[in-house]
Amino acid sequence: MALQAEEEETIERLKAWWKENGQRLVTIVVVVVAGYSSWIFWQNSQTATVSAASDLYEQVLSLAVTDGQTEVGAEDRQTIIDLSEQLRSEFADTDYARFAAMYAAQQYVAMDELASAEASLRWILDNPRSGLFSQPDEALELTASLRLGRVLLAQGEAEAALQLVNSVDPQSFEASYAELRGDIYVAMDRVVDAREAYTAAQQAGSTSSWLQMKMNSLADES
Protein backbone atom coordinates (compact mmCIF):
# COMPACT_ATOMS: atom_id res chain seq x y z
CA MET A 1 0.00 0.00 0.00
CA ALA A 2 2.83 2.36 0.83
CA LEU A 3 4.39 1.74 -2.59
CA GLN A 4 1.06 2.40 -4.31
CA ALA A 5 0.64 5.59 -2.36
CA GLU A 6 4.12 6.73 -3.37
CA GLU A 7 3.33 5.99 -7.01
CA GLU A 8 0.09 7.93 -6.82
CA GLU A 9 1.92 10.81 -5.17
CA THR A 10 4.55 10.73 -7.91
CA ILE A 11 1.85 10.74 -10.59
CA GLU A 12 0.16 13.71 -8.96
CA ARG A 13 3.48 15.55 -8.89
CA LEU A 14 4.02 14.79 -12.57
CA LYS A 15 0.54 16.06 -13.38
CA ALA A 16 1.19 19.24 -11.46
CA TRP A 17 4.58 19.70 -13.17
CA TRP A 18 3.04 19.13 -16.59
CA LYS A 19 0.26 21.55 -15.86
CA GLU A 20 2.84 24.17 -14.96
CA ASN A 21 5.54 23.41 -17.54
CA GLY A 22 3.99 21.23 -20.24
CA GLN A 23 3.06 24.00 -22.65
CA ARG A 24 6.50 25.55 -22.41
CA LEU A 25 8.13 22.17 -23.04
CA VAL A 26 5.96 21.59 -26.10
CA THR A 27 6.93 25.02 -27.41
CA ILE A 28 10.64 24.26 -26.91
CA VAL A 29 10.31 20.92 -28.69
CA VAL A 30 8.45 22.52 -31.60
CA VAL A 31 11.10 25.24 -31.91
CA VAL A 32 13.95 22.70 -31.79
CA VAL A 33 12.31 20.42 -34.36
CA ALA A 34 11.50 23.37 -36.62
CA GLY A 35 15.06 24.64 -36.31
CA TYR A 36 16.50 21.23 -37.10
CA SER A 37 14.15 20.84 -40.08
CA SER A 38 15.16 24.28 -41.35
CA TRP A 39 18.83 23.39 -40.97
CA ILE A 40 18.34 20.13 -42.89
CA PHE A 41 16.46 22.04 -45.61
CA TRP A 42 19.24 24.63 -45.79
CA GLN A 43 21.89 21.90 -46.00
CA ASN A 44 20.04 20.16 -48.81
CA SER A 45 19.56 23.47 -50.60
CA GLN A 46 23.27 24.28 -50.29
CA THR A 47 24.22 20.85 -51.60
CA ALA A 48 21.95 21.28 -54.62
CA THR A 49 23.36 24.76 -55.29
CA VAL A 50 26.97 23.60 -55.12
CA SER A 51 26.22 20.62 -57.33
CA ALA A 52 24.56 22.76 -60.02
CA ALA A 53 27.36 25.35 -59.92
CA SER A 54 29.97 22.60 -60.08
CA ASP A 55 28.37 21.12 -63.21
CA LEU A 56 28.52 24.49 -64.98
CA TYR A 57 32.11 25.08 -63.91
CA GLU A 58 33.13 21.64 -65.18
CA GLN A 59 31.84 22.71 -68.58
CA VAL A 60 33.97 25.86 -68.39
CA LEU A 61 37.07 23.83 -67.53
CA SER A 62 36.48 21.32 -70.31
CA LEU A 63 36.60 24.16 -72.84
CA ALA A 64 39.12 26.56 -71.29
CA VAL A 65 41.88 24.20 -70.19
CA THR A 66 43.87 23.00 -73.19
CA ASP A 67 47.24 21.33 -73.66
CA GLY A 68 48.93 24.71 -74.03
CA GLN A 69 49.32 24.31 -77.77
CA THR A 70 45.69 24.12 -78.85
CA GLU A 71 43.96 27.48 -79.05
CA VAL A 72 40.40 27.83 -77.81
CA GLY A 73 38.07 28.28 -80.77
CA ALA A 74 35.77 31.27 -81.22
CA GLU A 75 32.62 29.25 -80.50
CA ASP A 76 34.12 27.74 -77.36
CA ARG A 77 35.29 31.17 -76.20
CA GLN A 78 31.73 32.47 -76.37
CA THR A 79 30.44 29.39 -74.56
CA ILE A 80 32.94 29.95 -71.75
CA ILE A 81 31.80 33.56 -71.45
CA ASP A 82 28.11 32.56 -71.47
CA LEU A 83 28.65 29.91 -68.80
CA SER A 84 30.57 32.40 -66.69
CA GLU A 85 27.73 34.89 -66.93
CA GLN A 86 25.25 32.18 -65.93
CA LEU A 87 27.34 31.29 -62.89
CA ARG A 88 27.56 34.94 -61.88
CA SER A 89 23.82 35.37 -62.34
CA GLU A 90 22.63 32.21 -60.59
CA PHE A 91 25.46 31.26 -58.22
CA ALA A 92 27.28 34.52 -57.47
CA ASP A 93 28.17 33.45 -53.92
CA THR A 94 30.17 30.41 -55.04
CA ASP A 95 33.87 30.12 -55.80
CA TYR A 96 32.86 28.49 -59.07
CA ALA A 97 31.46 31.83 -60.27
CA ARG A 98 34.66 33.66 -59.32
CA PHE A 99 36.98 31.18 -61.02
CA ALA A 100 34.77 31.09 -64.10
CA ALA A 101 34.97 34.89 -64.27
CA MET A 102 38.76 34.52 -64.41
CA TYR A 103 38.46 32.23 -67.42
CA ALA A 104 35.99 34.62 -69.03
CA ALA A 105 38.48 37.46 -68.62
CA GLN A 106 41.12 35.28 -70.28
CA GLN A 107 38.86 34.80 -73.29
CA TYR A 108 38.08 38.51 -73.51
CA VAL A 109 41.81 39.30 -73.55
CA ALA A 110 42.34 36.80 -76.36
CA MET A 111 39.48 38.49 -78.24
CA ASP A 112 41.03 41.93 -77.55
CA GLU A 113 37.91 42.98 -75.66
CA LEU A 114 39.85 44.53 -72.81
CA ALA A 115 37.00 46.53 -71.29
CA SER A 116 35.02 43.31 -70.83
CA ALA A 117 38.08 41.58 -69.38
CA GLU A 118 38.47 44.45 -66.92
CA ALA A 119 34.80 44.14 -65.90
CA SER A 120 35.15 40.40 -65.23
CA LEU A 121 38.26 40.87 -63.11
CA ARG A 122 36.74 43.74 -61.16
CA TRP A 123 33.69 41.57 -60.45
CA ILE A 124 35.94 39.00 -58.79
CA LEU A 125 37.54 41.65 -56.59
CA ASP A 126 34.19 43.28 -55.79
CA ASN A 127 32.62 39.96 -54.81
CA PRO A 128 34.99 38.16 -52.43
CA ARG A 129 34.03 34.96 -50.67
CA SER A 130 31.48 35.87 -48.00
CA GLY A 131 29.80 34.27 -45.02
CA LEU A 132 30.26 33.95 -41.27
CA PHE A 133 32.94 31.26 -41.50
CA SER A 134 34.35 32.19 -44.91
CA GLN A 135 37.84 33.46 -45.55
CA PRO A 136 38.85 35.40 -48.68
CA ASP A 137 40.64 33.36 -51.34
CA GLU A 138 43.85 35.38 -51.32
CA ALA A 139 45.46 33.51 -54.21
CA LEU A 140 42.45 34.14 -56.44
CA GLU A 141 42.25 37.81 -55.48
CA LEU A 142 45.99 38.34 -55.99
CA THR A 143 45.80 36.68 -59.41
CA ALA A 144 42.77 38.78 -60.37
CA SER A 145 44.50 41.99 -59.27
CA LEU A 146 47.65 41.06 -61.19
CA ARG A 147 45.71 40.37 -64.38
CA LEU A 148 43.64 43.51 -63.91
CA GLY A 149 46.86 45.52 -63.68
CA ARG A 150 48.03 44.02 -66.96
CA VAL A 151 44.69 44.76 -68.63
CA LEU A 152 44.75 48.37 -67.42
CA LEU A 153 48.28 48.77 -68.76
CA ALA A 154 47.25 47.27 -72.11
CA GLN A 155 44.47 49.86 -72.27
CA GLY A 156 47.00 52.65 -71.80
CA GLU A 157 46.03 53.31 -68.19
CA ALA A 158 49.52 53.11 -66.71
CA GLU A 159 48.77 55.38 -63.75
CA ALA A 160 45.71 53.35 -62.77
CA ALA A 161 47.69 50.13 -63.14
CA LEU A 162 50.49 51.46 -60.94
CA GLN A 163 48.03 52.63 -58.30
CA LEU A 164 46.44 49.18 -58.24
CA VAL A 165 49.76 47.33 -58.00
CA ASN A 166 51.01 49.58 -55.22
CA SER A 167 47.82 49.00 -53.22
CA VAL A 168 48.29 45.23 -53.06
CA ASP A 169 50.40 43.16 -50.67
CA PRO A 170 51.69 40.60 -53.19
CA GLN A 171 52.88 38.02 -50.66
CA SER A 172 53.99 34.92 -52.63
CA PHE A 173 53.24 36.76 -55.89
CA GLU A 174 55.99 39.31 -55.24
CA ALA A 175 58.03 38.43 -58.33
CA SER A 176 55.06 38.73 -60.69
CA TYR A 177 53.95 42.03 -59.19
CA ALA A 178 57.47 43.45 -59.35
CA GLU A 179 57.74 42.50 -63.02
CA LEU A 180 54.39 44.12 -63.78
CA ARG A 181 55.51 47.24 -61.93
CA GLY A 182 58.58 47.28 -64.17
CA ASP A 183 56.38 47.02 -67.28
CA ILE A 184 54.32 49.95 -66.04
CA TYR A 185 57.41 52.07 -65.44
CA VAL A 186 58.63 51.27 -68.96
CA ALA A 187 55.32 52.53 -70.34
CA MET A 188 55.79 55.70 -68.28
CA ASP A 189 59.39 56.13 -69.55
CA ARG A 190 60.74 55.72 -66.01
CA VAL A 191 63.69 53.57 -67.03
CA VAL A 192 65.56 53.68 -63.71
CA ASP A 193 62.44 52.67 -61.78
CA ALA A 194 61.73 49.93 -64.31
CA ARG A 195 65.22 48.49 -63.90
CA GLU A 196 64.85 48.48 -60.12
CA ALA A 197 61.48 46.74 -60.39
CA TYR A 198 62.81 44.07 -62.74
CA THR A 199 65.79 43.51 -60.44
CA ALA A 200 63.38 43.12 -57.53
CA ALA A 201 61.46 40.52 -59.54
CA GLN A 202 64.65 38.54 -60.09
CA GLN A 203 65.59 38.81 -56.43
CA ALA A 204 62.11 37.57 -55.51
CA GLY A 205 62.84 34.37 -57.39
CA SER A 206 61.76 34.95 -60.98
CA THR A 207 63.84 33.01 -63.50
CA SER A 208 61.78 34.09 -66.50
CA SER A 209 63.79 34.36 -69.71
CA TRP A 210 61.27 36.98 -70.85
CA LEU A 211 62.13 39.07 -67.78
CA GLN A 212 65.81 38.82 -68.65
CA MET A 213 65.05 40.05 -72.16
CA LYS A 214 63.30 43.07 -70.66
CA MET A 215 66.35 43.76 -68.49
CA ASN A 216 68.63 43.51 -71.51
CA SER A 217 66.38 45.87 -73.45
CA LEU A 218 66.68 48.47 -70.70
CA ALA A 219 70.45 48.12 -70.75
CA ASP A 220 70.43 48.92 -74.45
CA GLU A 221 68.50 52.12 -73.72
CA SER A 222 70.99 53.32 -71.10
Question: Predicted regions span which residues?
Answer:
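N-terminal positive-inside, membrane-proximal cytosolic segments immediately preceding the first
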Residues: M1-V31, F41
